[in-house]
Design a protein with these regions (language model features):
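Charged catalytic carboxylate motif
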Residues: 43, 102, 184
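Short, intrinsically disordered, charge-balanced linker/junction segments flanking boundaries
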Residues: 105, 191-193
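Histidine/acidic-residue-rich catalytic or RNA/ligand-binding cores of hydrolases
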Residues: 150, 180-183
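N-terminal pre-catalytic segment of deacetylase/amide-hydrolase enzymes
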Residues: 1-31, 36-50, 66-69, 187-191
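H/E-rich (His + Asp/Glu) clusters that bind or coordinate divalent metals
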Residues: 157, 184, 192
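Metal-dependent polysaccharide deacetylase catalytic core of the NodB/CE4 family, i.e.
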Residues: 27-28, 38, 49-176
Length: 193
């Protein structure tokens, strides 16, 4: 079973986080998780330039450390960035102290007030501590572009089916999502415009 939209009960557990933005006009927020990755992030940046679209990249600190010039290029092209932990760790597997330490280590490189937990997983204590320093941005549409059980057309169909005004959509600029992303992202941008 795939869940492209977070269940209501989960959104109610973390009401202070941002799941979508209220919006009457046609405004959609594209976000990318897990980069920067040299094999895919430049392609994403070029595509966004081609369509004159800005996005927010939730970056993994260790990827930023390995690809500092690529991270700088994201910012140079006018996109926003957010923190996605240093090592893409799941909050539910770590103590509050260790999780916050990992997030803060990433922020030494990323320098952003935005945070998104990998897989959307965090504990109440972690969320409470994170809110002291960061704005927690979740999503209301996850494309599942990384899934081997979906093809690019199904990923695109997820975007069409679940997106509404104010939606925060998650794609992944990662190697495991590359094939589906290369198919679905251009079609999604065309459809969203």
């Amino acid at each position: 079973m795939f869940i492209e939209r977070p269940p209501l009960f989960y959104r109610m557990l973390f009401p202070e986080t941002i799941w979508r933005l209220p919006c009457k006009e046609k405004t959609i927020y594209l976000t990318f998780d897990d980069g920067p990755v040299p094999e895919i992030t430049p392609w994403v940046l070029n595509l966004l330039d081609y369509y004159n679209v800005k996005a927010t990249f939730f970056c993994v600190g260790e990827n930023v450390a390995r690809n500092t010039e690529l991270y700088a290029e994201i910012l140079k092209r006018g996109h926003h960035t957010g923190n996605h932990t240093m090592n893409h760790i799941q909050g539910t597997k770590y103590s509050v102290k260790d999780y916050i330490r990992n997030v803060d280590a990433a922020n030494e490189l990323i320098h952003s007030a935005l945070f998104r937990p990998p897989h959307g997983h965090m504990c109440f204590g972690q969320a409470h501590e994170l809110r002291q320093k960061y704005k927690i941005i979740m999503w209301d549409v996850v494309t599942r572009d990384y899934s081997k059980k979906l093809n690019g057309e199904r990923v695109f169909n997820n975007v069409k089916k679940y997106t509404r005004n104010g939606s925060i959509i998650v794609f992944h600029d990662s190697l495991k999502g590359e094939k589906n992303l290369r198919h679905a992202l251009p079609k999604s941008i065309e459809w969203l415009k």
